Amino acid sequence: MTVNFDLTVIWAFIIAFAVFAYVVMDGFDLGIGILFPTFEVGPERDRAMNSIAPVWDGNETWLVLGGGGLFAAFPLAYAVVLPATYPLIIAMLLGLVFRGVAFEYRWRDPDHRRLWDAAFTGGSLVAAMAQGMTLGALLQGIEVVDRAYAGSWFDWLTPYTLLTGLGTVAGYALLGATWLVWKLDGPSQHHARQLAKRAAWATLVLMGGVSLYNLGLRPEYAVRWLTAPEIYFVAPVPVLTGVVAIMLLRSLSVERHSKPFWLSLALFFFGMAGLGVTMWPFVVPPGLTIWDAAAPERSQMFMLVGVAITMPLIIAYTAWAYWVFRGKVADEGYH
C-alpha cells in the first residue's frame, strides 16, 4: 500500500510548531521585560534576569526557524506578509535588539543600569506588541492582487490589531510571571504570584475579546465556529481552553510552583490552536491558501531533509540547557 504525504501540510505544521515554540519560550523572556518596572530595584530585578540569562538568546532560534521556514516553504506568503507588515517587523526587530543589548549591558555598565533597565522594558514591550499586531493584521486579512500585496502602508493599524497586540502583551506577562513563580522563592515568588493573577485575568479577558471579534471579522470565520457540522469538530478547543483557564486560576490561588507555568503554556497552545482553526487552510486570508503559496514539491522535500536533521538537534540542545539550569535561582547568577 502506498502512503502519500502532503508536503505542504507537513510544512505548515512545522512552521506552526516553530512559531509556537518561539512564542512560549521567548514569551516568558519578553514577559519578564514587560513586568520589569514592577520589580524592586536591586536583588529582585537581578534574580528575575538571572532566571532567564542562560536560555534567553537560544530561545530566539525558533524565530529564525519559523521565519526561514516561511521564506523557504511558502515564498509567496513571505512576499505578501512582509510588505503588509514592514513597520511592525521593523519595530519587532528593533525591540529585540534593544532587549538583547540592554540584557548584557545592565551587568557590564552598572553606572547606567536604570537606562538599560528602561531599554530592556521598552524593547520587550515593543517586540511583544508588534508580534501581536502582526498576528492581528494577518487574521483580519491582507489585500492581494496579482500575487502581490495591494494594500496601503497602514492597513495593519486597526482596533482589532491593537486588541491582538494587547492580548499578546498580557499573555507574555502571564508567561513571565508564572516562570518567576517557578524559579524564585520567598517574597519575590509571592510578588510574582500576585502579578500572575492579574496577568491571567487580563489575558483571559483579551482572549475572549479577540475570539468574539473574530466571529464578526470575516464571514468564513463565523461559519467555521458557529455552523454545523464544523462546530462539532472545533468545539473541543474553547471547552479545553476554559478548563485550562479554571485550572490556572486555581493553581495561582495555592502554593504551586511549576504548575501555573505549564498551565499557561497549555493556555497558549489552545489559543494558538483556535487561531489555526480559524485561519485554516489560508496562510494569508482571505485569498492565499497554503497550497497557493507553497514552494515546488522538490524544494519542500529538499528542505524537509535538512529540517529532519536540524530540528531534533535544536530540541535536544534546548532540553539540555533547561535541564542544566533547572531549579530555583539564587542571588549568584549566570553573569
PLM features: what roles do these ranges have?
Residues 30-54, 71-81, 104-114, 176-195, ...:
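Juxtamembrane membrane-water interface segments of multi-pass membrane proteins
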Residues 11-22, 82-94, 121-126, 155-169, ...:
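Alpha-helical transmembrane segments
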Residues 55-126, 145, 224-232:
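Membrane-interface helix-loop-helix modules in multi-pass inner-membrane proteins
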Residues 284-303:
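Short, membrane-exposed interhelical loops at transmembrane-helix boundaries
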Residues 105-260, 274:
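Long, contiguous internal "core" modules enriched in hydrophobic/ aromatic residues
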Residues 1-13, 71-85, 139-159, 216:
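Helix-coil boundary and interhelical linker segments in multi-pass alpha-helical membrane proteins
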Residues 1-58, 64-67:
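N-terminal signal-anchor module of multipass membrane proteins
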Residues 99-106, 278-290:
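Transmembrane alpha-helical segments of integral membrane proteins
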